Amino acid sequence: MPVTDPELVAIVQKRVLKKYVCRKCGALNPWGATKCRRCKSTNLRPKHYELGGKR
């Protein structure tokens, strides 16, 4: 069931989608991270996301 309430959409984006992914080991890291928590690499990218329902 898609989320339509704008307040809930903001919560979902913050809790689920706003993460950094380590390019070296693939670990998910918090949005404010500068280094990977698992391998200590600084090669992080934002998680790719599109908010919407399944196709």
Swiss-Prot record:
<dbReference type="GO" id="GO:0005840">
    <property type="term" value="C:ribosome"/>
</dbReference>
<keyword id="KW-0687">Ribonucleoprotein</keyword>
<dbReference type="InterPro" id="IPR023657">
    <property type="entry name" value="Ribosomal_eL40_arc"/>
</dbReference>
<dbReference type="InterPro" id="IPR001975">
    <property type="entry name" value="Ribosomal_eL40_dom"/>
</dbReference>
<keyword id="KW-0689">Ribosomal protein</keyword>
<dbReference type="GO" id="GO:0003735">
    <property type="term" value="F:structural constituent of ribosome"/>
</dbReference>
<protein>
    <recommendedName>
        <fullName>Large ribosomal subunit protein eL40</fullName>
    </recommendedName>
</protein>
<dbReference type="GO" id="GO:1990904">
    <property type="term" value="C:ribonucleoprotein complex"/>
</dbReference>
<dbReference type="InterPro" id="IPR011332">
    <property type="entry name" value="Ribosomal_zn-bd"/>
</dbReference>
<dbReference type="Pfam" id="PF01020">
    <property type="entry name" value="Ribosomal_L40e"/>
</dbReference>
<dbReference type="InterPro" id="IPR038587">
    <property type="entry name" value="Ribosomal_eL40_sf"/>
</dbReference>
<dbReference type="GO" id="GO:0006412">
    <property type="term" value="P:translation"/>
</dbReference>
<comment type="similarity">
    <text>Belongs to the eukaryotic ribosomal protein eL40 family.</text>
</comment>
